[in-house]
Amino acid sequence: GCLNLENKINDSLSPVPEFRLEIQENTIVLTVYEGRYKPYLYKGKAYKRNDSSTVEVDRLEYNRLILEGCNQTFEEITSFNQQLTFAKLETEFIRVMGIEKINKDILKTLELYSDQSGFNNAAALLADDNQFTGIDIIRFGDTIDEIMDRESLENISILSQLEKTLQMFRKYYQYEKIEGAERKCIDKIPEKAFREAIANALIHRMWDIPASIKVSMYADRIEISSPGGLPAGISEEEYLNGQISILRNPIIGNVFFRLKYIEKFGTGIMRINHAYRNALIKPSYQCFSNSIKVILPVIRENYDLNEA
């Protein structure tokens, strides 16, 4: 029985995974260990568990398995466009780091360029022009049928996307209040929370999905939906507790960290919640298989965030 089963595994699977067969009384116990050489094919096809059934993986998932087997991420793949410019990235590094200009050595240090492969996808995402989708922002009126404003940001640096999204936020969720001789800027939604949510969407989303980050602006809230569910190995509870130790796009995350767009890896949820620490109504989070949604509510009008 064991020999027959072993032969079937060797004949049907490629590459053959590491496994162990044990006989326990009248039962054969088969233990299969996670392999490093993904994807593992059964009669030339890759499969996955989907609830209680087994289904063939689609082309996108198959490509991800190949990358995983090569110990490579999407952002590390060589960019098909090697004629990249970095004016926005250079401006930000001059502002924050005080450098004179960006050169190849700096790009190598940031892991955006190598002599062997040239620029990678992370570099393309940070470049002034690229082929990627970005952020779709809609400001709704009283109903979802009433669109007051819309901006689709794509094919530009994700640094520019963050900046332009913040400009739209300030247009609708900040106002000035005159107190005596002073003008005070009041946030309807904490800007720190919104900035953190957008920065996290950009560095944690799945970039191999041709879909935009959706920013839906309502009178009482903002909803931010980013493509891609939780990284493998992270539970929803760990995510909600701010325990994201697995960074889906570490190269981009490192650039955002150096530019002080984020303070520390994996602390986004905690920082969003901290911005609402004195508010009565709190942010909420929804995790789906292919997306994550962050909902930032407008705080009550007489609550002053600047005093929090």
Residue ranges and their predicted role:
Residues 1-47:
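Divalent-cation
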Residues 27, 221-223, 291:
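Structural motif
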Residues 30, 125, 294:
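A residue-level signal for conserved active-site and pocket-lining positions in enzyme catalytic cores
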Residues 35-41, 230-232, 300-305:
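Short, charged/polar, Gly/Pro-enriched secondary-structure boundary elements
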Residues 37, 51-211, 217-233, 237-246, ...:
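Active-site helix-to-loop segments that bind/position phosphate- or nucleotide-bearing substrates
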Residues 78-82, 133-135, 234-308:
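Flexible, glycine-/charge-rich segments associated with ATP-binding catalytic modules
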